[in-house]
Amino acid sequence: MNKKMGKIVAGTALIISVAFSSSIAQAAEEAKEKYLIGFKEQEVMSQFVDQIDGDEYSISSQAEDVEIDLLHEFDFIPVLSVELDPEDVDALELDPAIAYIEEDAEVTTMQTVPWGINRVQAPIAQSRGFTGTGVRVAVLDTGISNHADLRIRGGASFVPGEPNISDGNGHGTQVAGTIAALNNSIGVLGVAPNVDLYGVKVLGASGSGSISGIAQGLQWAANNGMHIANMSLGSSAGSATMEQAVNQATASGVLVVAASGNSGAGNVGFPARYANAMAVGATDQNNNRATFSQYGAGLDIVAPGVGVQSTVPGNGYASFNGTSMATPHVAGVAALVKQKNPSWSNVQIRNHLKNTATNLGNTTQFGSGLVNAEAATR
């Protein structure tokens, strides 16, 4: 609908039309704001529009000029979108045919900050300018699917029959979102939204993979200058090959962050149990150890892992439980620390995360405590 402008004169049975000079009209136009006028009936609204078209309208009030620019007439609800001077609203509200007048307020897409992101105090670190810029993070998982809330820089696949990094399972995309979901007013927010994110597919669409594939993924991370490798995967059995790969990646400068496991047992799973992997357990909203989270002497640190909302394939979002969900919180905070201290080694970053963690008590249950982005970026 074309924009229509009508002159309204508020006054008892007084119907006139006044011409403004161009300078006055321009000033009046600049003073106008957008409003929505709701009418009690559709028919009455149509009569109102006809009067605007004819530059005629009257209401019982003190005589004063009211000018309305009609922007849109809804045909399924009795509402008009208009522009008018805010000072004229009171006069229009005296019309008994008008049910309400409200500002045509701005509405934006809503971004949710998941509880875990707040719990590790990532938004405070981000407000200081630490968002992971310049830090390369590899997610060794089921791949990462394209998503409006993720910026993927590249990656590689080491799963036979699945040559690209697209995620046929969903797990890797969820992990990636906790690390790196963009600060873009949609969906969710990650711990380190500006990291350089890489998908390294070592698990197939079924959610499983081989030791050789995971070792190749670690080799890729080392050879391609990754600063951090997130491994939200594990096994109850150790592997000499896997341990060598973790050790070599660490020697190459990669901080390997791994999930402690989900059996609830009092020992840490593999590869998190290896000395050169940072073992991450899970906590709930009450800072208790999640019942499924494996624990023990080898546990380094904990992070939120219950009801973690993040990205999933298909531009969607969902909530999950697991130490797999806790681990990317730690990987993300590690990226913030690396940005703040670019010369620090992976060993320095690991120690710093442990030294700045929030003490939750029993070290067997919680390691050094809850990862704390605010304290880690002071």
Curated annotation (Swiss-Prot):
Q: Which residues form the active site?
A: D141 (charge relay system), H171 (charge relay system), S324 (charge relay system)
Q: Write the record's keywords in alphabetical order, separated by commas.
A: Calcium, Hydrolase, Metal-binding, Protease, Secreted, Serine protease, Signal, Zymogen
Q: Which Pfam families match?
A: Inhibitor_I9 (PF05922), Peptidase_S8 (PF00082)
UniProt entry tagged with the keyword Transmembrane = no
Needed cofactors, names only, are: Ca(2+)
Q: Binding positions for Ca(2+) 1?
A: Q111, D149, L182, N184, I186, V188
The note describing how and how many cofactors are bound reads: Binds 2 calcium ions per subunit.
Primary localization: secreted
Task: Please give the Gene Ontology molecular function terms for this protein.
Answer: metal ion binding; serine-type endopeptidase activity
Q: Which residues bind Ca(2+) 2?
A: A272, Y274, A277
Q: Where does the signal peptide begin and end?
A: 1-27
Q: Name one GO cellular component term.
A: extracellular region
Q: Which intervals hold domain Peptidase S8?
A: 114-377
Q: Where in the cell is it found?
A: Secreted
Its biological purpose: Digests elastin efficiently, has a substrate preference for Ala in P1 position.
What is the similarity comment for this entry? Answer: Belongs to the peptidase S8 family.
Q: What is the protein name given in its UniProt record?
A: Alkaline elastase YaB
Query: What are the top taxonomic ranks of the organism?
Result: Bacteria, Bacillati, Bacillota, Bacilli, Bacillales
